[in-house]
Amino acid sequence: VEANSKLGLISGLVGALAIGPLLGIGHFSAAAALLIGVAFFGAATIAARQLPKEAIAPKPAEAAERLELRSAGIVLASAAMMSIRGVIGFLTFHLLFWIREDYGLAQFGLAAAASTLGSMAGNLVAPRLRRALREEVMLTIALSVIAGAGIAAAMTGGLLTAILVAFVANFSAAIGRLAFDSIVQRDAPDANQGRAFARYETRFQLAWVMAGLPPVFFTMPGQVGFVVVGVVAAF
């Protein structure tokens, strides 16, 4: 779990280093920024294909694995994590279109940077929190903080508030993810970890995508979006 936290920290650091130059390039040529992104993804694909081909789950899941992954604790934790990931997807696109319309695309770069810094900080703090708190408590705190931030932002509004919400939400999401990973490893010792986490991550990514669709189709006022964030995280 701590290894995953370190990987998240590294990916956040790389993203933070790349976002500044790309924003500068995008200011002069959006096509150039997109081409650079395509080049990076292409290089990553080539590197991934060079990894050793190993079967993570050569055999179907056994009864013990299925039973453990259906335990109440894991089911509730996965539902909580799905809510968190959905909120992050919604918030990302809500901020993109709202800030672009009301303030400008450059200001969205500040929110994107705050999101990256929040994820990095969460991955840095989460292992330390895990030594002091139970994983269920960490997940509850993560949801509560996101809900509180959303409601507070709905009451105040403004660009600075949006940037703070982006930081807090991604900070809490990183903590929640480490807590979820720990719960699965603790409560499903007989499960194939690679297979289990691949399935959960697929569900979480789908939640991120589906929750991001409404603000793509309907640009809503900033404070309305923050109400949605607060309500979804609260329930």
Where would I find each of the regions flagged by the language model?
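MFS-fold secondary transporters
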Residues: A48, A149-A154, A169
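A membrane-interface helix-boundary motif in multi-pass transporters
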Residues: L23-A39, A106, V216-A234
